[in-house]
């Protein structure tokens, strides 16, 4: 396959608690079009436990994936014989789910003699703005989700430099833990955002972790502990206490995030010049307060903020299909012994928080 062809790729996503499949077209000029994008969330299955249970997630993927793939193909109006490639998220993620998705993709590719592309889930997030907005390289990615918080220089397909990461909790993880601590329902992120809208952020003097440091790393464990200490002091909590705690927590996250992104953008400019855009991806980007803060950060850095539509910020099959198509256009495919991975760094040389070194993402 070459970039001069129109490519049709099926993408499969099963790394956490969304079972998803999509068909995406990549045209010869590099533009893309989503033909179908089917996502089945497992929130109802995991809500009684207050978080994702890996075994339940894997079993749900087994039960759901065949039907979701069939629906994606039907909605796209195409057949397996017409596919240019089959892409699956091969990690990082919950290993049981990753195995389900990758094995399914291998079976389809083998039966129909179609190229297989084993996609890094993080790379799929990184390349989504090229599908939605035709964003040109290089750009600065802020990936914030329940499992990941990273600032990444996106220099090309498979060419990434991690500028900053969290040394403890991911932002989405911290939101979920605060929600659980305060007795709010799962999933916690939207609940904290909703409560914060009715709270007084100035009531508590919560710390702003890592503020002013020259690196671009994040830390949220100390902030989380400060919230826990205040909640324990106020027990039993009144509804307004919960709102104020959420507001104070979210305000501290916003201040820390803005400072850390500012540092990341400075590192980007020092190494690679001005970014074409600041791109936000991951489920945390759906938080409206965070979006407002990101707009301010981008304006201060004199760059453009790009945020994919909410349905493409959270885990989905279209981003996997698109990353597969981008790699396929460069002739990058995988063999049937491609392994599922629970851990898979986007920048393979970034072994310590804040270390950055240019690398090609290998498969």
UniProtKB/Swiss-Prot annotation:
Enzyme Commission number, as recorded: 2.3.1.234
Gene Ontology MF: a single term: iron ion binding
Subcellular location: Cytoplasm
Role summary: Required for the formation of a threonylcarbamoyl group on adenosine at position 37 (t(6)A37) in tRNAs that read codons beginning with adenine. Is involved in the transfer of the threonylcarbamoyl moiety of threonylcarbamoyl-AMP (TC-AMP) to the N6 group of A37, together with TsaE and TsaB. TsaD likely plays a direct catalytic role in this reaction.
Name of a matching Pfam family: TsaD
Protein name: tRNA N6-adenosine threonylcarbamoyltransferase
A GO biological-process term: tRNA threonylcarbamoyladenosine modification
Keyword Transferase appears in the UniProt entry: yes
Cofactor field: Fe(2+)
GO cellular component: cytoplasm
Residues the record lists as binding substrate: 143-147, 176, 189, 287
Natural source organism: Rhodopseudomonas palustris (strain BisB5)
Catalytic activity: L-threonylcarbamoyladenylate + adenosine(37) in tRNA = N(6)-L-threonylcarbamoyladenosine(37) in tRNA + AMP + H(+)
Binding, Fe cation: 121, 125, 315
Family recorded in the similarity comment: Belongs to the KAE1 / TsaD family.
Cofactor note: Binds 1 Fe(2+) ion per subunit.
PANTHER family reported for this sequence: TRNA N6-ADENOSINE THREONYLCARBAMOYLTRANSFERASE, TRNA N6-ADENOSINE THREONYLCARBAMOYLTRANSFERASE, MITOCHONDRIAL
Keywords, comma-separated and alphabetical: Acyltransferase, Cytoplasm, Iron, Metal-binding, Transferase, tRNA processing
UniProt keyword RNA-binding, yes or no: no
InterPro entries listed in its UniProt record: ATPase_NBD (IPR043129), Gcp-like_dom (IPR000905), KAE1/TsaD (IPR017861), Peptidase_M22_CS (IPR017860), TsaD (IPR022450)
